[in-house]
């Protein structure tokens, strides 16, 4: 477990359950078990880490890993091979303080029902998976080059592209 590793989260709340349910149609049970995604930032020395994530307050880098999936679970996976870690982390650092993409969440919901027909998002805003997807693109993750719109990538899509196993 090192800085830059990706954290796939499964929380217990209603919003998390809705995200998992919506992803299940396109990504199946294995990948759709995750409803939030973050990236390890700094080791706190006590077994906990701070994480980069997009949350309702915007993009942050100070929340503790132990707090981001309340009542649920998380899985840490290595940054995919071939990703330039310096560029990946550099991109995340540059986005700290940007606002949350509430319109992108709405756009994701429309995409699941009416693929590529309605695009709703505001520039300089992020959802959790869009932030990580953009960082992966910036870091040179080749599998990400096939994503038609990294602003509306969902956690299951990243899990699938990173070829995680159940």
Where are these regions (language model features)?
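Cysteine-nucleophile amide-bond enzymes
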Residues: 1-166
């Amino acid at each position: 477990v090192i800085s830059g590793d990706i954290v796939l989260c499964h929380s217990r709340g209603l919003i998390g359950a809705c995200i998992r349910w919506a992803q299940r149609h396109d990504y199946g049970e294995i990948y759709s078990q995750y409803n939030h995604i973050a990236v390890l930032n700094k080791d706190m020395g006590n077994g906990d880490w701070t994480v980069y994530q997009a949350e309702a307050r915007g993009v942050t880098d100070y929340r503790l890993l132990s707090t981001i999936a309340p009542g649920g679970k998380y899985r840490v996976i290595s940054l995919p091979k071939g990703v330039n870690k310096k560029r990946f982390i550099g991109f995340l650092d540059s986005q700290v303080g940007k606002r949350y993409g509430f319109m992108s969440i709405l756009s994701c919901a429309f995409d699941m029902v009416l693929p590529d027909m309605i695009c709703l998002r505001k520039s300089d805003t992020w959802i959790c998976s869009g932030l990580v997807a953009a960082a992966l693109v910036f870091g040179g993750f080749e599998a990400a080059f096939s994503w038609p719109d990294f602003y509306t990538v969902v956690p299951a899509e990243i899990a699938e592209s990173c070829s995680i196993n159940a």
